[in-house]
Every structure is written in structure tokens, then in C-alpha cells.
């Protein structure tokens, strides 16, 4: 699904990729849409565990934002193109599954927005609209799945460091530098 997209990927493609027959794959899933939902749910589980849960434990909003940006960027570099499924295949889900995934994405959006609201209240946020800033940060991070190549000249830690600086400087008046 990562390479071809949902519509162009057949159940035979999926069965071949996991070393099963087409009939055998139905022992594990009811259909392609159920598999898509499971993939998206797994992606959101990773965000919950690797980004949201650690960030929610941090009371300082600047440190929380830094953690969100770093951890999400690191996760994108680790899973690569698989993120595109979560970003681009929502319309292939049933309405009930779409609501579930949208709700989980919305909770993450709200965490970032609340963090930016706290930074604004402390006078640390640039004079930017919170909705624009929140979607911009999410867009910047998620777009890494499009351009990052593991064989590039920069190491993942260097990319995360540089990305963090770009992202924080985009929204904060004077971000503290953390090596």
C-alpha cells in the first residue's frame, strides 16, 4: 500500500508481501479496508506512545513543544513512507473508521494547539494564528515522509536537530537552544 496506494494495491499484492495465499490472508483480516484501518490505527498508536504520552508529562510548554517536534520527526525518519498511508488514504476508510482515525488525529492537533496557547499566554509565541501555526507544524513534520531518504548526506540525528531548530524558530520568539 505504501508504494502503490490503497486503490491500486490488490489482495494478491498483500498476500504476496506477507507470504500467504489470497485465501490465507482472509484468515487474518476481513478485507483490504480493515487492513487499512489497522495500519492507520497502528500508526496512531505509535504517535500516542512515542510522542503524545511523553509530551503530556512535560509541564513547560516550550520543552513540551520541543519534545513533540523531536519525537515526531524521529518517528517519521524511522518509519518513512508508511506515514503517507495515514496522511493520504483517509477517504478509503468506512465512515465509522474515518471518524475514529480523525478523532485520534484531532486529539494530537489539540495537544499541539494547547501547547501553543500556553506559549502565547507566556509571551513566547510569535504573533501568528494558532490554527495556522498548529497545522504548519504538523505539515512540516509529516512532509518529511515525502523527502527523507535514508541514503542522504545527513544522519537522522542531524536532520532531527536541524528540523527542530527550523520548526521552533518558526513559531517561538526566542527558542532556547538545546543541543
What residue ranges belong to the model's regions?
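Helix-turn-helix
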Residues: 2-34, 38
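Short coil/turn segments at alpha/beta junctions that flank glycine-rich nucleotide-binding fingerprints
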Residues: 3-7, 58, 79, 122-123
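Short beta-to-alpha loop/turn elements within the nucleotide-binding domains of ABC transporters
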Residues: 30, 59, 154
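Hydrophobic/aromatic-rich alpha-helical bundle segments in the mid-to-C-terminal region
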Residues: 83-91, 98, 120-166, 174-179
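Alpha-helical segment immediately C-terminal to the catalytic phospho-histidine in histidine kinases
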Residues: 96-104
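Alpha-helical structural segments
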Residues: 3, 17, 34-57, 63, ...
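Short helix-capping/turn signature of helix-turn-helix
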Residues: 6, 29, 87-93
Amino acid at each position: 500500500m505504501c508504494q502503490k496506494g490503497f486503490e491500486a494495491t490488490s489482495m494478491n499484492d498483500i498476500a504476496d508481501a506477507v507470504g500467504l495465499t489470497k485465501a490465507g490472508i482472509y484468515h487474518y483480516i476481513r478485507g483490504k479496508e480493515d487492513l487499512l484501518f489497522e495500519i492507520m490505527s497502528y500508526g496512531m498508536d505509535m504517535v500516542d506512545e512515542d510522542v503524545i504520552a511523553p509530551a503530556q508529562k512535560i509541564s513547560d510548554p516550550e520543552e513540551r513543544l520541543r519534545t513533540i517536534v523531536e519525537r515526531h520527526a524521529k518517528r517519521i525518519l524511522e518509519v518513512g513512507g508508511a506515514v503517507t498511508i495515514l496522511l493520504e488514504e483517509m477517504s478509503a476508510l468506512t465512515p465509522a473508521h474515518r471518524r475514529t482515525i480523525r478523532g485520534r488525529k484531532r486529539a494530537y492537533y489539540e495537544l499541539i494547539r494547547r501547547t501553543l496557547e500556553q506559549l502565547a499566554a507566556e509571551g513566547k509565541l510569535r504573533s501568528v494564528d494558532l490554527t495556522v501555526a498548529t497545522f504548519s507544524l504538523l505539515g512540516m513534520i509529516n512532509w518529511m515522509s515525502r523527502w527523507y531518504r535514508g541514503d542522504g548526506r545527513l544522519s537522522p540525528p542531524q536532520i532531527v536537530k536541524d528540523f527542530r531548530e527550523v520548526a521552533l524558530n518558526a513559531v517561538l520568539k526566542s527558542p532556547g537552544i538545546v543541543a
